[in-house]
UniProtKB/Swiss-Prot annotation:
It is found in: Cytoplasm. It is an enzyme of class 3 (hydrolase). The active site is at residues 88, 212, 240. InterPro entries: AB_hydrolase_1, AB_hydrolase_fold, MES/HNL. Its EC number is 3.1.1.82. Its main location: cytoplasm. Homodimer. Inhibited by methanol and phenylmethylsulfonicfluoride (PMSF). An additional type 1 isoform with the same enzymatic activity seems to exist. It comes from Raphanus sativus. The keyword Cytoplasm applies. GO terms for biological process: chlorophyll a catabolic process; jasmonic acid metabolic process; leaf senescence; salicylic acid metabolic process. This is Pheophorbidase. Keywords: Chlorophyll catabolism, Cytoplasm, Hydrolase.
Amino acid sequence: MGGEGGADDSVVHFVFVHGASHGAWCWYKLTTLLVAAGFKATSVDLTGAGINLTDSNTVFDFDHYNRPLFSLLSDLPSHHKIVLVGHSIGGGSVTEALCKFTDKISMVVYLAADMVQPGSTSSTHDSIMTVGEEDIWEYIYGEGADKPPTGVLMKEEFRRHYYYSQSPLEDVSLASKLLRPAPVRALGGADKLSPNPEAEKVPRVYIKTAKDNLFDPLRQDRLVEKWPPSQLYILEESDHSAFFSVPTTLFAYLLRAVSFLQL
């Protein structure tokens, strides 16, 4: 467990990666619980998200989008046991980070996230973004209406149902002030990772959200079947945003997951 030990003492360090339109801010409950329990916990704003000043309409490359995460990981000391936690489409970001920083990462946790094996031809990008027949997404055309969209944001009237159906109203209100368009072109790069056998040796955990109106639990099951993780947990009362709706249960599952790490 993390603490103020010597430079060679192992420290469990959770690094949280948000999904589309969210930012480091959405993990405030989890990071508070983990730090109080003696762990290190860091949440990162990807390019164009949260308080990162980049205009998301200018982010076209997946590496560019993930650059703040890569910078953070490269700076962390070797005695930190890094546990990457990715939410929703942020699962693609943590998978790319796993492939680039395999030797530094001790575990990867996918929370209602796209968990696709590097080199696979399957994609969950569309499965998360497509919900029934409703037009729930607003597209931004930063280069003009005659060019492909540069950004995407869920329409305000749908957010409560799809993102936060079980979450406290104060968190819904907070999110309404902080959500930003996601760089839709950059996110397509999550499907283009090369096979990486070494990265596949790192323990993976999947946490399913059973009352998720955005990422159908049955689709989450298919991800688990295609690329089975070493641990599987189910948040029975969680919407898509477990960090808001069931933070204490999620916290308990994270503690259970890392208890299997060899420190």
